[in-house]
Amino acid sequence: TNYFQTVPTSALESALFLESDRMGHLLGGLTEESVKTQIGVVSNEKRQGDNQPYGMVEYAQSENLFPVGHPYHHNTIGSLEDLAAAKLDDFKQWFKDYYGPNNSVLVLAGDVNAAQARPLVQKWFGDVARGRTVPPVNAPIPTLEAPKKIVLKDKVPATRIYRNWIVPGLA
């Protein structure tokens, strides 16, 4: 998950407050109703992406470049079936496991320096509880036994050709 805030330097503290509130206190706001709403939102986003021209290409790439069981074999958003099956307790556990400062990167760019930012980051994120220690994902770089040629048919105005390679550091 990526969150971006584009704010003037004068709003840095407000942006840090908002992000620390999301990271540290969202769990209390998760309800059956809010989860149901978000499942609907994400399902619609998935359908919109799938129904765009060439929208199914990414799935074919992942499924054909990475073997079953590899963490990159499936698209991040999952399937509509996965989304429909998700329960409030699943969201809460995921939040507890992964939504913490020990599993996050905060990047500040622009007219700000470390001497200004560090005290504000400490102020707003200092009391946010760590999540569990997340073990590294086992994502070996697979080797295809032979070249693959996959042809997808879609109602699009132009042919598009994709050539994919799996390389170290990008897999």
Question: What kind of feature is each model-predicted range?
Answer:
Residues T1-A11, K36, Q48-N103, D127-A171:
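Non-catalytic beta-strand/loop surface segments
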Residues A114-R118:
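Extracytoplasmic/secreted cell-surface and envelope-processing proteins
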Residues R22, K123-V128:
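Conserved short hydrophobic interaction patches
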Residues F17, P119-L120:
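Generic recognition of short, well-ordered alpha-helical segments
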Residues T6-Q38:
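M16/insulysin-pitrilysin zinc metalloprotease superfamily fold
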